[in-house]
Amino acid sequence: MDEEETAEINAQEQEVAGSAGEAAAGPSGAEVQPNDDSVAVERVIDVFEETAEMEAAMIERFFGPSGEVAEEGTLPVPGPSADGEGSANAGGERPSEEDIVLDDGTESDGSYNRPGSDMSLDSPNSEDDSDVEAMPRWMIPQNRLRFAVDMMVSQARNQDGGIAALLNRDNFLQRVRSMVFSQERRRSRNSDEVSPEAEDDELPEHPPPPPPRPPIDIDMEEGVHFDTNLPAEHSYFGPNLNRVPGVNYQEVGSTHHMLIFLHQYILFPGEVLPFMIDGSLFDDDMSGLDGLIFAVAFPLMKPPEDSKKLYGVTCQIYEKGDNGRHLTFYKSRALQRIVINCSDIKGLPQYIARNPTNKCHSKVKILPEYFLPEPLKCIDMGSMSRFRDIPSMRDKYLRYQISSTPWPVEVCQEYAYEDIVERARKKLEVHKIDTMPKCPIQMSFWLVRNLHLTEKMMSQMFLTDSVNLRLQLIGGILKEETLFYCRYCNSSLAYCSDLFAMSKHGVQTQYCNPGGYIHETNTVYRVISHAIGYSGEPSTRFSWFPGYQWHIILCKFCAQHVGWEFKAVEPNLAPKVFYGLAGSSVRIGKAGDSATVNGNNFVVRNMLRVISEGME
């Protein structure tokens, strides 16, 4: 593979890395309108450009060219136009706290004060106001501007449309200034009431995360429980699917020449990968009735010290069907981990979720799975072995075994995994999951997908050849409380403790929409209050969960697509409502993560940058 093809592959990787949750976001392929920060920024800049001439006229009218106040003691508030039309404050009077009302009808409460924020005017960490008097009166100090924008962002959080709707409203600059003057008046009113001791109190750097909520018990809901076998069958592909026999595992360490594709998510052996593709790419390679084995590589999981290799899995097709549009539905299952040398790739590999048109082949090597059984279970103690399965004698028997071996207790426990499996089983009982495999190799991969680890941990698990080490790593994170965060603004969306299985494969499953885009979906009972908004209308077309309608949900802060709400349309179906979070739009993080809890800092920082540029 030459340098030109390598450069094109890297370009595709960057495109996928930056396009998580792209246009084909709905199960039916319905597009979510782009609503990213760049669009909001352009909107704010347009507002400033439209009011540039008005700003200059008002400054000269009220203050004069030098910025001096025309009349001592009066601080005018500019209106939406140079002549003051449409503004209640065109006469130059400063609005009172009670009169400040945002365009969405939300009143500005003068008592707003975000604890621990570095944007607070009364905080010891706020910017120095010593140079405020030296500035022209019509200029807004940076710390007051920051506090006003922070307040507007917090109020917009509880309104439909989120931050994008806030930026798209008219008179944005006027509302920012009104908020500043309202807070200034409140500050002067309360300055005498604040004691010196209170000012010296240090506040926490970040507001605490919302407290965990009590778990929902689906067994208490009335109605017929949803059949978790239905999503696993991917029945939304239609009834015209034919079973393809044959499951072939390749010998460990062997090298094979096979068709390869790229994928934006990490697949572990045992997972099902549904996709839609031009059948002509497979017809020539499928021999008889045996299922085709092909390779799927993960370019976003390149180890930094080994960038010339790609890691992935082999997949075997076990079901296929025609959709009548020159495309073929396929269902495949991941079998074994593989490694690919980039120099062995013949052709340009394409993403399997983007309707590939060209074939690409390469040599792949099957990676091993090393598993060492528990040392004490390998010791045959003759007639005493019968005490191993007696609960009352198990501990005594274990101590006797350890005393008769040359290894210390730590060595024996290092390779013990039954305790880890039991703790994982108890944790997953909350999620109503009872499909844990018994084979240690398959169980290690299954636990990685259902315990919801961070992306870094998942990559580490995939690259580990030792099953024992993989289980030890899993045991180390069982007690950690984790949340789903928006990948774009770090706003907290849902608790991982609210996960539950709507599919027999677990809480995280991959689904395909009619556009061919593959979504990794995490099902949760509920999301954090005021964390989401909605886009478009609900629909039952191509629903991944039969009997439920889907509705696109957006992050309330950044208005980016983060998943779907599923609501039962058939009577007596339980659960009545649940949510599917798109893996491309969310990330897993610890509850005490240093990242922003509610996304305020991210949004405020970008809004302040644009406002500052517009006021220069």
From Swiss-Prot:
GO biological process assignments:
positive regulation of neuromuscular synaptic transmission; positive regulation of Wnt signaling pathway; protein ubiquitination
Question: Locations of Acidic residues compositional bias?
Answer: 96-107, 194-203
Which molecular-function annotation in GO is an example for this chain?
metal ion binding
- Subcellular location per the Swiss-Prot or TrEMBL entry: Nucleus
User: What are the Low complexity biased-composition ranges?
Assistant: 11-32
Q: Which CDD domains match?
A: CRBN_C_like
- What is this protein identified as? Protein cereblon
The major lineage groups are: Eukaryota, Metazoa, Ecdysozoa, Arthropoda, Hexapoda
